[in-house]
Amino acid sequence: MLMLSTMTLIIFIITIVVMMLATLLSKKTLLDREKCSPFECGFDPMNSSRLPFSLRFFLIAIIFLIFDVEIALLLPMIMIIKTSNLMNWTITSLFFIFILLIGLYHEWNQGALEWNE
């Protein structure tokens, strides 16, 4: 176990040293106005090249990702119903679903699921 810990520490230190050397030896580029601005036929751009996104779009995407992970956590619970104690499985499943419903209620109550705004 000591050898595994020592090797892990050595590999971690070597990785950090290599990354620091790569950062120090890499070619530094100076950013000026031409490099930071989008190219538009050699002329200055007429308007901003970035379109504004609604923060609500990102919030809905994060909520979808969280609920997707929750579904992925619920699926194995169905598989282990045959091998586990039914009472323990029921209590664990109901507790987990209760926590998910509390989260859904909180998001609904905060208005995070409303598209009309």
UniProtKB/Swiss-Prot annotation:
Listed Pfam families: Oxidored_q4 (PF00507)
Listed EC numbers: 7.1.1.2
Annotated transmembrane regions: 1-21, 58-78, 86-106
Native source organism of the sequence: Anopheles gambiae
Subcellular location: Mitochondrion membrane
Chain's gene name: mt:ND3
Keyword NAD attached: yes
Listed GO CC annotations: mitochondrial membrane; respiratory chain complex I
Topological category with respect to the lipid bilayer: Multi-pass membrane protein
UniProt protein name: NADH-ubiquinone oxidoreductase chain 3
Domain of life per record: Eukaryota
Protein family (similarity comment): Belongs to the complex I subunit 3 family.
Catalytic reaction list: a ubiquinone + NADH + 5 H(+)(in) = a ubiquinol + NAD(+) + 4 H(+)(out)
Cross-referenced InterPro entries: NADH_UbQ/plastoQ_OxRdtase_su3, NDAH_ubi_oxred_su3_sf
Major localization listed first in the record, in broad terms: mitochondrion
Annotated function: Core subunit of the mitochondrial membrane respiratory chain NADH dehydrogenase (Complex I) that is believed to belong to the minimal assembly required for catalysis. Complex I functions in the transfer of electrons from NADH to the respiratory chain. The immediate electron acceptor for the enzyme is believed to be ubiquinone.
Example of a GO MF term: NADH dehydrogenase (ubiquinone) activity
Keyword Nucleus listed: no
Swiss-Prot/TrEMBL keywords: Electron transport, Membrane, Mitochondrion, NAD, Respiratory chain, Translocase, Transmembrane, Transmembrane helix, Transport, Ubiquinone
